[in-house]
């Protein structure tokens, strides 16, 4: 008999589903290190393998859209570090992990530490823009914290000498690689702040692997850079190398040479700017003097223009000019009047009716002659057509047929006789000849037999 408050009863499906949800929601994404075994890649492109250590193992799957980002081919027995989600395959109740990313174990562990420290310092606000100190402009002294034998120091000094040879440089030599390097870098930063000899610091080194650059991913170095009162420019490795020091520094330069470019002034450019400013000043002075000279000349000219004798001379000149203009205007007026009179005379001559009458009479005579010619031609053509019509009518007239010896005989009812069967003996007939008619009586009717010819 079951107790009154019985525990929940799960089906197998519900149990597997509940466990899967607990694993996915409670565990979330985790980092796992282990050795690869039983690696397979079917036609789908997915990877299936087992991740194990000395005492345990777990099944893993890495789908194609994730494994295409892996830069190496996993091998049996290889130690790797994976980032994965824990889940459960419900149909079989198999516990497994779904891998999102994979790295070789050594580099992967460093990368994991890098990400953890980055997240920690970012959460504390060490990367916030509000804490970034502005660089001095211009810098009066530059401090360099790097290896005294490295290529980075050579590059920095070469650029500073080329751009600003007079800029003082203080070198704080330190190791940049190895177990002692982080502590030495921290002490060099603190020493530079204690002496307060320079107003900007370059902290960096040349390129290398992740392990080579690891000193600049050390938490002690990051906090020392953040605590520095002197602005810090990080210059670690190449442009693609990004360290924790780059995030904490007041400014990140992609290379040591670029850092030297940032903190220094280009003396050649400054010289060009001074020369340009001098040229602008000289041009401004020349313009000012020319403007003052022109103004003085204008005032002097105006004073000269106000002299009484000059005014009288100008008025006399104006009077002479007006007299010439009046004379010229009068001559032009008379000339225009004469030209107008000539044009009117020409127009009047053009309007004389006699030439028009003569032309009209000539035109009428021409038209009368043409009309007479047309009438004569039309009359001749009409006569010719009439003669042709008469000739044609005469040719088809029955009278013409009678004139050739033929006659037309009609019965008493006026019908023209064509066959002998139309008449009977004793009937009266009328025959039309060329010059009159004949009436006759039928005495005898004699039909004509037609001969029939056989065609062979």
Swiss-Prot record:
Q: Which family does it belong to?
A: Belongs to the XseA family.
Which top EC class is given?
Answer: hydrolase
User: What functional role does this protein have?
Assistant: Bidirectionally degrades single-stranded DNA into large acid-insoluble oligonucleotides, which are then degraded further into small acid-soluble oligonucleotides.
Report the record's Gene Ontology biological process terms. Answer: DNA catabolic process
Looking at the keywords, is Glycoprotein present? Answer: no
Q: Which Pfam families match?
A: Exonuc_VII_L, tRNA_anti_2
Its EC number is 3.1.11.6
Q: What name does UniProt use for this protein? A: Exodeoxyribonuclease 7 large subunit
- Tell me the superkingdom of the source: Bacteria
């Amino acid at each position: 008999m079951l107790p009154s408050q019985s525990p929940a009863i799960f089906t197998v499906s519900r149990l597997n589903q509940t466990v899967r949800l607990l694993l996915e929601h409670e565990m979330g994404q985790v980092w796992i290190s282990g050795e690869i075994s039983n690696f397979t890649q079917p036609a789908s492109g997915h990877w299936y393998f087992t991740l194990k250590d000395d005492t345990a193992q777990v099944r893993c799957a890495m789908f194609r859209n994730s494994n295409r980002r892996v830069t190496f081919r996993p091998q049996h027995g290889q130690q790797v570090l994976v980032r994965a989600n824990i889940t459960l395959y419900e149909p079989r109740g198999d516990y497994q992990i779904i891998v999102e990313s994979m790295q070789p174990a050594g580099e992967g562990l460093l990368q994991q530490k890098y990400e953890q420290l980055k997240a920690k310092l970012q959460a504390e606000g060490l990367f916030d823009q509000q804490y970034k100190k502005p660089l001095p402009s211009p810098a009066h002294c530059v401090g360099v914290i790097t290896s005294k034998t490295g290529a980075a120091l050579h590059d920095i000094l070469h650029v500073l000498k080329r751009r600003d040879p007079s800029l003082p440089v203080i070198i704080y030599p330190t190791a940049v690689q190895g177990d002692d390097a982080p502590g030495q870098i921290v002490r060099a930063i603190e020493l530079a702040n204690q002496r307060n000899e320079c107003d900007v610091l370059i902290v960096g080194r040349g390129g290398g692997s992740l392990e080579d650059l690891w000193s600049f991913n050390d938490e002690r170095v990051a906090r020392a850079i953040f605590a520095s009162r002197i602005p810090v420019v990080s210059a670690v490795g190449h442009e693609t190398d990004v360290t924790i020091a780059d995030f904490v520094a007041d400014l990140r330069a992609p290379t040591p040479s670029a850092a030297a470019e940032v903190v220094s002034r280009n003396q050649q450019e400054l010289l060009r700017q001074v020369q340009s400013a001098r040229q602008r000043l000289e041009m401004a002075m020349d313009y000012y003097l020319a403007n003052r000279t022109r103004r003085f000349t204008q005032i002097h000219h105006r004073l000269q223009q106000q002299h009484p004798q000059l005014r009288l001379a100008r008025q006399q000149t104006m009077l002479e000019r007006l007299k010439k203009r009046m004379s010229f205007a009068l001559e032009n007026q008379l000339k225009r009047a004469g030209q107008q009179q000539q044009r009117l005379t020409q127009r009047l001559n053009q309007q004389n009716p006699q030439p028009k009458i003569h032309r009209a009479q000539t035109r009428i005579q021409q038209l009368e002659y043409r009309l007479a010619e047309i009438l004569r031609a039309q009359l001749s053509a009409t006569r010719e057509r009439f003669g042709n019509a008469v000739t044609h009518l005469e040719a088809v007239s029955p009278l013409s047929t009678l004139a050739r010896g033929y006659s037309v005989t009609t019965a008493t009812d006026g019908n023209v006789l064509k066959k002998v069967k139309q008449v009977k003996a004793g009937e009266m007939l009328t025959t039309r000849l060329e010059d009159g008619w004949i009436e006759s009586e039928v005495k005898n009717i004699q039909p004509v037999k037609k001969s029939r010819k056989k065609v062979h």
